[in-house]
Design a protein with these regions (language model features):
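NAD(P)-dependent Rossmann-like dehydrogenase/reductase catalytic/cofactor-binding core
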Residues: 45-162
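Internal alpha-helical scaffold of NAD(P)-dependent oxidoreductase catalytic cores
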Residues: 1-63
Length: 162
């Protein structure tokens, strides 16, 4: 039995470990970080301000679209977005899938063969693991994209000074 998102589901240890590690490195964390950073960088390289690039990359995703997606699914989210968003998403999704699927296959194989578990074991076993992790997290925190996040979050209605 696996536990996920507040419910139980039937699985095996091998399937749960494989899907869990693939998900964490893939769409749940690693891939989403890479995707968001790539889009942010492209917008910045083409003259968009940090706040604008962050808003169009992360803020709208987390504040507007993901709640719709979580509530009733991708098709419902599409049906409740602008026509330009609908058409663009439907046209571009296959291109992203074609570009990303080979990386996901490579990742899955790396997980299935135990390579990803070994990387984690080796990394987590080093005496300076925590210091290196903190340095990596600080580097992420200090990126322009995440500094812009602080500015954009201050603009949310719930953060408005009354």
């Amino acid at each position: 039995i696996g536990i996920g998102a507040g419910y139980l589901f039937k699985t095996t240890f091998q399937r749960e470990a494989t899907s869990d590690l693939t998900g964490e490195r893939g769409s749940l964390m690693g891939a989403i970080e890479g995707l968001l950073e790539a889009q942010y960088e492209v917008l910045r390289e083409h003259g968009h301000s940090p706040s604008e690039a962050f808003n169009e990359t992360v803020e709208e995703l987390t504040q507007s679209l993901m709640p719709l997606f979580a509530e009733k699914g991708m098709d419902w989210m599409y049906a409740n977005c602008s026509t330009t968003a609908q058409r663009g998403a439907l046209d571009w999704a296959p291109r992203f899938r074609e570009a990303i699927k080979p990386v996901m296959e490579w990742l899955y194989l790396s997980v299935k063969t135990g390579n990803e578990a070994q990387i984690s074991i080796d990394s987590n076993s080093k005496p300076d693991y925590r210091e290196k992790l903190n340095a990596e997290l600080k580097a992420m925190h200090d990126m322009e994209m995440w500094r812009a996040a602080e500015t954009v979050r201050e603009l949310r209605p719930e953060n408005e000074v009354k």
